[in-house]
Amino acid sequence: MQEASAAITAERKHSHVDICLNRPVCFDGQDTGLDSWRFEHNAAPEVDFAQIDLSTEFLGHAIGLPLMISSMTGGYGNALALNRALGEAAERFRIPLGVGSMRQALEGSSHRESFSVVRSSAPSVPIFANIGAPEVAAGLSRDQLSTLIDLIEANGLIVHLNPAQELFQPEGGTDFSGFLDRLHDITATIGVPVIAKEVGCGISATVARKLADAGVRAIDVAGAGGISWQKVEECRYLDRFGHEERFSPSALDEFLNWGIPTAECLTSIQTLKRQNPEYDALSVISSGGIRNGLDIAKSIALGANIAASAQHLLKALHSGTLEETIRTWANDLRAAMFLTGSATIEQLKHARIYRKP
C-alpha cells in the first residue's frame, strides 16, 4: 500500500516538472513588484568593480553568492540526473540547495537515491531537506523527519506552506489544523535550522511573526510573480477531468493568481523586524519570480539575506545553460553593487532604493 502511494507521488512529481517546463503557469496580471523599485545611482562609488565581494553567510554557512537553488524536484526516476546536475552547480558556485518535497522518500524506497545524490554531488555546501505543512500537521514524527535529514545529510529542514496548491491539487491535503503547534515541536527537537517556505503565494508579516514564534530560523517568502502552483494543479485537474467544476468561473482567475507579490512580502517583513528587535535574527529568503541578479540585489536592499530561484534555473538546466545563467546573475548582482557603491553584500543591504513614482 505504501509503495503504491509512493508511485502516485512519484508520478505527480514528474508531472509537476513537465508542466512547469512546458506550460504557461506563471502569474498573469500580477508580478513580483520588484520592477517598481529603483536603486539610487551612485556616481562616485569608490569601489573597484573587480574587488566586489559577493560572498555572504546564511544560517551559519559561508556561501559564494546570495543565491539558493530552490526546492524543485526528487522522488522519481528522471529526478536523479536533475538533482545531480543541480548539486554539481551548487558545489561549483558554493551556493545552498533545497531538494523538492521528500514525502515520497517516506512512502517508499524506490527513488531515494534521487535525493541522496544531491549530497554526493555537493559535499561542502548547505543542503536542505523538505517536507510539506500538511504532513507536519498530520503528525509526522521526529524519527521520520530525522530519516529525511539523514538521507541527504541535510544542514536544515524546509517546511513548505502550500494551502493554495493543495486546494487546487486533485488529491490535495487541505487539513492544516494544528500546524503551528506541531511546527513548534519540530523546531524545538529536530536539531537543525527550520526554514518555512511558501511556494508562490507569499508570506505576510503577520504569518512571518507566527512562524518565527514557532521557532523557524528563516522565512522563504516565495511571493506571487513566478510560478502559480494553482495553475500547475489546474493543468493536472483539467488533464484528468476535462473541465473545471469546483469554482465559479468569475472567481477562478483570481484564485489562480492569488498571492502577495514578492516585494510586498519583503518590505512588510523588513518593517516587522525593524519595529520588533526580537525578530532581528530571522533570516529572509526572497523567491517567487526571481529572474536575474538585479532582482537579487533589489531583494537584499529590501531586507532579504539571500534570494532563491526554481523555475528559471530548472529551465536553464534543461537548455544546458545552468552555469552560464548563474554566472550571468552573479555579474548582474556585481553590477548593481558597483553602481550603488556597495563593495560587500552587507553594504548592499544599506543601499538607497526607492519606489518608482
Swiss-Prot record:
Single GO term (MF): oxidoreductase activity
CDD domains xref list: IDI-2_FMN (cd02811)
Keywords of this entry: Cytoplasm, Flavoprotein, FMN, Isomerase, Isoprene biosynthesis, Magnesium, Metal-binding, NADP
Binding site for Mg(2+): 166
Keyword Cell membrane set for record: no
Stored InterPro entries: Aldolase_TIM (IPR013785), FMN-dep_DH (IPR000262), IPdP_isomerase (IPR011179)
A single BP term in Gene Ontology: isoprenoid biosynthetic process
Catalysis: reaction(s): isopentenyl diphosphate = dimethylallyl diphosphate
EC number: 5.3.3.2
Any Pfam family: FMN_dh
Annotated residues for binding of FMN: 70-73, 101, 130, 197, 289-291, 310-311
Keyword Glycosyltransferase: no
GO CC annotation terms, alphabetical: cytoplasm
Cofactor: FMN; NADPH; Mg(2+)
Domain of life according to the entry: Bacteria
Cell location: Cytoplasm
Subunit structure: Homooctamer. Dimer of tetramers.
Function according to Swiss-Prot or TrEMBL: Involved in the biosynthesis of isoprenoids. Catalyzes the 1,3-allylic rearrangement of the homoallylic substrate isopentenyl (IPP) to its allylic isomer, dimethylallyl diphosphate (DMAPP).
Family membership: Belongs to the IPP isomerase type 2 family.
Name of the protein this chain belongs to: Isopentenyl-diphosphate delta-isomerase
The organism's taxonomic lineage, starting at the top: Bacteria, Pseudomonadati, Chlorobiota, Chlorobiia, Chlorobiales
